[in-house]
Amino acid sequence: MEISYYEILEITQSADKETIKKAYRKMALKYHPDRNQGDKEAEDKFKLVNEAYEVLSNDEKRAIYDRYGKDALKGGGFGSSSSGFGGFEDLGDIFSSFFGEGFGSSSRRRKSSNDEKIPSDFIVNLKLSFKEAVFGCKKNIDFTYKCSCKTCNGTGAKDGKLQTCPKCQGRGQVGVSQGFITFAQTCPDCQGSGEKASEKCSDCKGLGYNESKDSVELNIPEGIDTGMKLRVNAKGNILKNGTRGDMYVKIIAAEDDTFVRDDDDIYIEFPVFFTQAILGQSIKVPTIRGEATLNLPKGAKDGQRFVLEKEGVKDVHSSRIGNQIVQISIKFPTSLNDEQKELLEKLSESFGIKDGMHQEQKGLFEKIANWFKS
């Protein structure tokens, strides 16, 4: 069964124009190709969303569709317009009508020819071991940066001379049709500038920049963690005017087989023998700095957590130190010798367990038996 235009936009048949427009905006943003590159299913849904909107936003088409169905719209002068929106030049224009100038039309989104071909800043990833991140270290980083080509002044063109891009006619964007809609994409030939080199610069091969290698030693602070960034001043790319941006080092810290880190706190699961849990004993547990004493209370339970204050990680921005949380896992013997078995049987009897049943268990059975009798 073919899905209806109302179902495609997830609205009811009684929806007014404003509701239809809001629904279209939501669905178009969700399935837009720029957000779902390489996703064929999203591309197909995007086409359906636009098809549904073109019909339901037009009173005449909607009336015909409601009365006779989709087939009645084929032919008879009810085909799609050249743009698919009748009055909107491209997707940027309709988004602009919804959201304001931030989305802009193609003419407003053209890049300036004075724009840099390279960003001033860039990011490099740095992998650290668990200990390196927790305690800090020194690291040498080799990196590649870009320098705006002096020969062509960063244009990528021989002698720095550019001409109007023939593909987009200087607009910086080209129209791409998908079903009922024609939307604008950045021109692949000029990358949105509207200008292109007729002859490439021999020094930078038309890129507008040259690459160089460098290295720097970094002091990694104690307590750094995955996702954090360190800024290295004046180690970024070099622009046309000679200014140099910054390099940002993004940290990727490895996990540990024993300790689990959560911000500045450390978690560890530690095995405890059942007699230690019952009697309550002082035990030694490992920490990231060595070991610490944990005083177990009598009758400690499996999975119970205990906090060792200031045995965690130092906060990277202050002198505060996190805690270590120890979760105990109570262990029982899997095999017993004759002497151990005899001792445990005597212990069991001393707790009033006879005929394999404790007094509390007997009481529960009696309670259930009385329940059946009533």
Swiss-Prot record:
<feature type="binding site">
    <location>
        <position position="168"/>
    </location>
    <ligand>
        <name>Zn(2+) 2</name>
    </ligand>
</feature>
<dbReference type="GO" id="GO:0005737">
    <property type="term" value="C:cytoplasm"/>
</dbReference>
<dbReference type="Pfam" id="PF01556">
    <property type="entry name" value="DnaJ_C"/>
</dbReference>
<keyword id="KW-0863">Zinc-finger</keyword>
<dbReference type="GO" id="GO:0008270">
    <property type="term" value="F:zinc ion binding"/>
</dbReference>
<dbReference type="Pfam" id="PF00226">
    <property type="entry name" value="DnaJ"/>
</dbReference>
<feature type="repeat" description="CXXCXGXG motif">
    <location>
        <begin position="201"/>
        <end position="208"/>
    </location>
</feature>
<dbReference type="GO" id="GO:0009408">
    <property type="term" value="P:response to heat"/>
</dbReference>
<feature type="binding site">
    <location>
        <position position="152"/>
    </location>
    <ligand>
        <name>Zn(2+) 1</name>
    </ligand>
</feature>
<dbReference type="InterPro" id="IPR036869">
    <property type="entry name" value="J_dom_sf"/>
</dbReference>
<dbReference type="GO" id="GO:0042026">
    <property type="term" value="P:protein refolding"/>
</dbReference>
<feature type="repeat" description="CXXCXGXG motif">
    <location>
        <begin position="149"/>
        <end position="156"/>
    </location>
</feature>
<dbReference type="InterPro" id="IPR036410">
    <property type="entry name" value="HSP_DnaJ_Cys-rich_dom_sf"/>
</dbReference>
<feature type="binding site">
    <location>
        <position position="201"/>
    </location>
    <ligand>
        <name>Zn(2+) 1</name>
    </ligand>
</feature>
<dbReference type="GO" id="GO:0051082">
    <property type="term" value="F:unfolded protein binding"/>
</dbReference>
<feature type="binding site">
    <location>
        <position position="165"/>
    </location>
    <ligand>
        <name>Zn(2+) 2</name>
    </ligand>
</feature>
<keyword id="KW-0862">Zinc</keyword>
<keyword id="KW-0479">Metal-binding</keyword>
<dbReference type="InterPro" id="IPR001623">
    <property type="entry name" value="DnaJ_domain"/>
</dbReference>
<keyword id="KW-0677">Repeat</keyword>
<dbReference type="GO" id="GO:0031072">
    <property type="term" value="F:heat shock protein binding"/>
</dbReference>
<keyword id="KW-0346">Stress response</keyword>
<dbReference type="GO" id="GO:0051085">
    <property type="term" value="P:chaperone cofactor-dependent protein refolding"/>
</dbReference>
<protein>
    <recommendedName>
        <fullName>Chaperone protein DnaJ</fullName>
    </recommendedName>
</protein>
<feature type="repeat" description="CXXCXGXG motif">
    <location>
        <begin position="165"/>
        <end position="172"/>
    </location>
</feature>
<dbReference type="GO" id="GO:0005524">
    <property type="term" value="F:ATP binding"/>
</dbReference>
<feature type="domain" description="J">
    <location>
        <begin position="4"/>
        <end position="69"/>
    </location>
</feature>
<dbReference type="InterPro" id="IPR008971">
    <property type="entry name" value="HSP40/DnaJ_pept-bd"/>
</dbReference>
<dbReference type="InterPro" id="IPR012724">
    <property type="entry name" value="DnaJ"/>
</dbReference>
<feature type="binding site">
    <location>
        <position position="187"/>
    </location>
    <ligand>
        <name>Zn(2+) 2</name>
    </ligand>
</feature>
<dbReference type="InterPro" id="IPR018253">
    <property type="entry name" value="DnaJ_domain_CS"/>
</dbReference>
<comment type="subunit">
    <text>Homodimer.</text>
</comment>
<dbReference type="Pfam" id="PF00684">
    <property type="entry name" value="DnaJ_CXXCXGXG"/>
</dbReference>
<keyword id="KW-0143">Chaperone</keyword>
<comment type="function">
    <text>Participates actively in the response to hyperosmotic and heat shock by preventing the aggregation of stress-denatured proteins and by disaggregating proteins, also in an autonomous, DnaK-independent fashion. Unfolded proteins bind initially to DnaJ; upon interaction with the DnaJ-bound protein, DnaK hydrolyzes its bound ATP, resulting in the formation of a stable complex. GrpE releases ADP from DnaK; ATP binding to DnaK triggers the release of the substrate protein, thus completing the reaction cycle.</text>
</comment>
<dbReference type="InterPro" id="IPR002939">
    <property type="entry name" value="DnaJ_C"/>
</dbReference>
<keyword id="KW-0235">DNA replication</keyword>
<comment type="similarity">
    <text>Belongs to the DnaJ family.</text>
</comment>
<feature type="binding site">
    <location>
        <position position="149"/>
    </location>
    <ligand>
        <name>Zn(2+) 1</name>
    </ligand>
</feature>
<feature type="binding site">
    <location>
        <position position="190"/>
    </location>
    <ligand>
        <name>Zn(2+) 2</name>
    </ligand>
</feature>
<feature type="repeat" description="CXXCXGXG motif">
    <location>
        <begin position="187"/>
        <end position="194"/>
    </location>
</feature>
<feature type="zinc finger region" description="CR-type">
    <location>
        <begin position="136"/>
        <end position="213"/>
    </location>
</feature>
